[in-house]
Amino acid sequence: MLFSLTFLSVFLKITVLSVTAQQTRNCQSGPLERSGTTTYAAAGPPRFLIFLQGNSIFRINTDGTNHQQLVVDAGVSVVMDFHYKEERLYWVDLERQLLQRVFFNGSGQETVCKVDKNVSGLAINWIDGEILRTDRWKGVITVTDMNGNNSRVLLSSLKRPANILVDPTERLIFWSSVVTGNLHRADLGGMDVKTLLEAPERISVLILDILDKRLFWAQDGREGSHGYIHSCDYNGGSIHHIRHQARHDLLTMAIFGDKILYSALKEKAIWIADKHTGKNVVRVNLDPASVPPRELRVVHLHAQPGTENRAQASDSERCKQRRGQCLYSLSERDPNSDSSACAEGYTLSRDRKYCEDVNECALQNHGCTLGCENIPGSYYCTCPTGFVLLPDGKRCHELVACPGNRSECSHDCILTSDGPLCICPAGSVLGKDGKTCTGCSFSDNGGCSQICLPLSLASWECDCFPGYDLQLDRKSCAASMGPQPFLLFANSQDIRHMHFDGTDYKTLLSRQMGMVFALDYDPVESKIYFAQTALKWIERANLDGSQRERRITEGVDTPEGLAVDWIGRRIYWTDSGKSVIEGSDLSGKHHQIIIKESISRPRGIAVHPKARRLFWTDTGMSPRIESSSLQGSDRTLIASSNLLEPSGIAIDYLTDTLYWCDTKLSVIEMADLDGSKRRRLTQNDVGHPFSLAVFEDHVWFSDWAIPSVIRVNKRTGQNRVRLRGSMLKPSSLVVVHPLAKPGADPCLHRNGGCEHICQESLGTAQCLCREGFVKAPDGKMCLTRKDDQILAGDNADLSKEVASLDNSPKAYVPDDDRTESSTLVAEIMVSGLNYEDDCGPGGCGSHAHCISEGEAAVCQCLKGFAGDGNLCSDIDECELGSSDCPPTSSRCINTEGGYVCQCSEGYEGDGIYCLDVDECQQGSHGCSENATCTNTEGGYNCTCAGCPSAPGLPCPDSTSPSLLGKDGCHWVRNSNTGCPPSYDGYCLNGGVCMYVESVDRYVCNCVIGYIGERCQHRDLRWWKLRHADYGQRHDITVVSVCVVALALLLLLGMWGTYYYRTRKQLSESSKKPSEESSSNVSSNGPDSSGAGVSSGPQPWFVVLEEHQQPKNGRLPAAGTNGAVVEAGLSSSL
């Protein structure tokens, strides 16, 4: 709707079509966004890395995205540094003896000046605008301006200087000696030269930590001594050592914040670790065909303090840098500036104070053939109805459709004198291929991740929703507020936590997890909800893994998907074992079935609270994507064609776009919420996807083929980055951030943690204090102004101490519900489709990972598996007796890569600690009113009154014999019982639900003619046999009727013959009385005794015999006079 209103306001009277043209965008507003009384600082640009690989210079974000080549042929021997304010990279090509520079986007490459061939170090003084170089042979440090002019020698007579560094905020420079392991320091004036330390080994890498004012270095040491990074303060004291993960000598290092980055010989990767401990490691794997990276630099505003960021610069400065369409006062500039100071399309006002728009259409120099429209800073050509604008953006051509096939054009085609030409709808332009359209009016949304705002027929700009900032590419949007987003994902036997850049990778929950495939979180109460497949219940815990508690323990069979309605305060899950979708409130007390008809094997599920809809995948015999209301009504089929096994499903709540993955087709697809505009996002390179999540500009999905988590651009499916690290089967995953689930109000739960007033803003709780109070340093509590003054006076260092705690890494303290596995190593794979690690092409087996052993790398099976690293098999801890399950009170259930303990019947607990249930005291026994219940270990006995004197007598009114069996005078529970009320309606077609203890499952006893777990399928073999038997009976009946009918016809014919003869004889008798007389006389003779019976019709009867299964293939036979005849009919005629 937003797009439609904006688009119509610009193009209400324009009906022409547009083609290629340059996009023009306005400069953005200031760096702060205001929402009520709360001010949010806009997020600065993301940090990225610049490094040399081979003879090319690359850049890449620390999370592995935006990997691109800046300089193709930079030289082989290179030293380099950057100037953040200029947005430029400087480097020295030692072979060509040139100092060169290029912008961070790869444009504007130029040569600054010639240099000597012995340059051994380069550093940028970003405050004074100077370049410092060391010459190892001349032993000098030279200083020039940023254009290579005004050269002067700062220091001379040095011993082979190299690795020069500068901290202009402290007015200090540092360098090392090539031959010895010495570190030196001087001020920027070349005075106060000091040697900080001396070491026997050569210092190969030297870097500065501007934040903590420390030096970090690595040395080319003896065998076994290359595994350390050393540091000291600016005075050479407080020396510290950390161990790095590389197996060879380091080539380069960089520092940013609390992270240290490095690369090493023979390793095509960049390591990222905690600079204090060397742990919390992330490995960024680059193209395996390349050489190790060198000259690593972290580019960010804070890497060069005092640099004015473009986001913090004045409007005039930003517009000058980008030559945007801004109006600004010249009072901020040189008053003698001329019109060249204004951006293109603008000119100086008459009073020379402002830049104003130039009306190119009025100047008649626009070149448009038919129509011209002026816009601020530019113009565009228009055409009347029936004409279209040609690719030059100037000429109009009559609209003549192309004949025949025009499928190569993404939108439409016209016929011109130069041949067929692809065209685009108004507001979009043709891409470089001349076939594909892009723009606000096309499906790619102009390349904008969120909002596309048209400026003209051929130009537009991108914008973002509240809470997001437009990034440097002017297309992507990133969250501008809140904590750092992270991933939560189920890894079959545990739940893990990881930031997008692979840092803070740890296990949150692993104890008694079994098999977990379903997971989601509640942003209001900051809770994780997950389903246990092996233990058949649903739990929840805090986002840090603490305070585990069971929520739903009855009626859960095989949960494979779970979704939390963070607004309606409910949870929904799919149960493939019961073929249902169920729901409950967050307490688990109001449990109900949502969908049970026409559903086979539901798996993934997503909820849209604002649309009040459920979306799910069904992997059964008729794979499909479906939707319904939150109550299960109004079911809608989203997709059913071209599906094999749709698994995960997710919603982009900002654009109302549905995403799903198909495990067997190895594809990710997207569509509108009603199933329209369906298209494939990625194909053939997503492995075995199981689950999805969407946030910012990316789709995340889990892969079982190469156990890992992958992300791609949510619009194009490109820029694939893979994160892996000792994963088994990563399943359900979610992105945790206040903006990930819009509309969440954390103030609803315990007032958002605020003592006084809580205001929700973009998914976060903003605490305010009542009049007369001020906020405490924790931002939650409120203090009286008097207490605040005391706090500021007597405890002056407290605020500093609190700030330090807030800025320090959060400690991970394990408890009973969590493990100490916070040292997991994450790997970022940015090598495209090529997959290779230190263990060789293809890596290790599916249940193994690659580890370092000295300078070698070997495959090692994951925990819970055994083998040679290439082939690893699950260890059955239950069979081996190596589990921690108490044998008397619990049973061991083996799972892939682990096991879980489940309390036996009659016990309760967490599976490892099980206590006897006193059924008699709880009233959960099955004894009759007249019996006495006696609790036993793991069970109970029912005793009849007077039973010892009368053993074996049943108790009157005892529990049903179907549930109890006789054992002397006691009634004990049988192994088969009925199902709980939650299973009502589970068995279909007349089936009876019952619990079988031996298999620990609820099963259905189907009536004859039906089969399946829920008796949902007809027994085709039984129906076929029944049909065949019915057919045989039908055939026999038909034949029998035919035989009877034939017999009746014969009898009727015989009776007719007899009647005819009788009448004829009577007629003849009347004509010959003498003959009749003589005949009557003779009939009374002795030989006429038998002839008397034949004077009337002889009696006939037929006996039919049915042959149910004739073996000789002959029809059923008939007999005369009671005799059975094998074939045909017989008579005495």
Swiss-Prot record:
Annotated segments matching region Disordered: 1069-1097
GO molecular function, one term: epidermal growth factor receptor binding
Keyword 4Fe-4S: no
Keywords tagged on the record: Disulfide bond, EGF-like domain, Glycoprotein, Growth factor, Membrane, Repeat, Signal, Transmembrane, Transmembrane helix
Biased composition (Low complexity): 1076-1090
LDL-receptor class B repeat residues: 87-128, 129-170, 171-212, 213-259, 485-525, 526-568, 569-611, 612-655, 656-698
Matching SMART domains: EGF, EGF_CA, LY
Membrane topology note: Single-pass type I membrane protein
Quaternary assembly: Interacts with EGFR and promotes EGFR dimerization. Interacts with RHBDF1; may retain EGF in the endoplasmic reticulum and regulates its degradation through the endoplasmic reticulum-associated degradation (ERAD). Interacts with RHBDF2.
Protein name stated in the entry: Pro-epidermal growth factor
Organism expressing this protein natively: Rattus norvegicus (Rat)
Gene: Egf
